[in-house]
From Swiss-Prot:
Listed name of the protein: Stathmin-3
Function: Exhibits microtubule-destabilizing activity, which is antagonized by STAT3.
CC terms in the record's Gene Ontology section: cytoplasm; cytosol; Golgi apparatus; growth cone; neuron projection
Coiled-coil annotated spans: 75-179
GO molecular function: protein domain specific binding; tubulin binding
Organism, scientific name: Homo sapiens
Length: 180
């Protein structure tokens, strides 16, 4: 079953390449052309401006004859040498160290940025507090001066009233002495 699936995948890759090559050489397809590929049968349905359409028919595993050759597995990779493996390991280790250094650098930059932001926020807070305190002190001084000026004005009026009352009393006493 697994070999059938892998064969199907390979044939689908080959089919698209084959179709491209055939369409280059034969611009007019043969009507009802059927292609046989091992355990697959491919029928060309129609050709459109947008592309071609095909019908792919897979034969069941029971229909496959034992005489049909098994499709070869993909070529094996060549054995890698110890030196090559060592180079790969060293390169991987170097990439890991570089990535780790980059992460540490980013963390350090982020911490430095956080410190700068915190320092700036504290500085702005201190400036705001100092300005608010200066403004409050100014208002208190102004209020104190206004209050003292108001009290001085009240004292002055009171003194003037007392002087006027004393003058009125004197005038009254003088009239009483003259009349009496």
């Amino acid at each position: 079953m697994a070999s059938t699936i892998s064969a199907y995948k390979e044939k689908m890759k080959e089919l698209s390449v084959l179709s491209l090559i055939c369409s280059c050489f034969y611009t007019q397809p043969h009507p009802n052309t059927v292609y046989q590929y091992g355990d697959m049968e491919v029928k060309q349905l129609d050709k459109r401006a947008s592309g071609q359409s095909f019908e792919v028919i897979l034969k069941s595993p029971s229909d496959l004859s034992p005489e049909s050759p098994m499709l070869s597995s993909p070529p094996k990779k060549k054995d890698t040498s110890l030196e090559e493996l060592q180079k790969r390991l060293e390169a991987a280790e170097e990439r890991r160290k570089t990535q780790e250094a980059q992460v540490l650098k980013q963390l350090a930059e982020r911490r430095e940025h956080e410190r700068e932001v915190l320092h700036k926020a504290l500085e702005e807070n201190n400036n705001f507090s100092r300005q608010a305190e200066e403004k409050l002190n100014y208002k208190m001084e102004l209020s104190k001066e206004i209050r003292e000026a108001h009290l001085a004005a009240l004292r002055e009026r009171l003194r003037e009233k007392e002087l006027h009352a004393a003058e009125v009393r004197r005038n009254k006493e003088q009239r009483e002495e003259m009349s009496g």
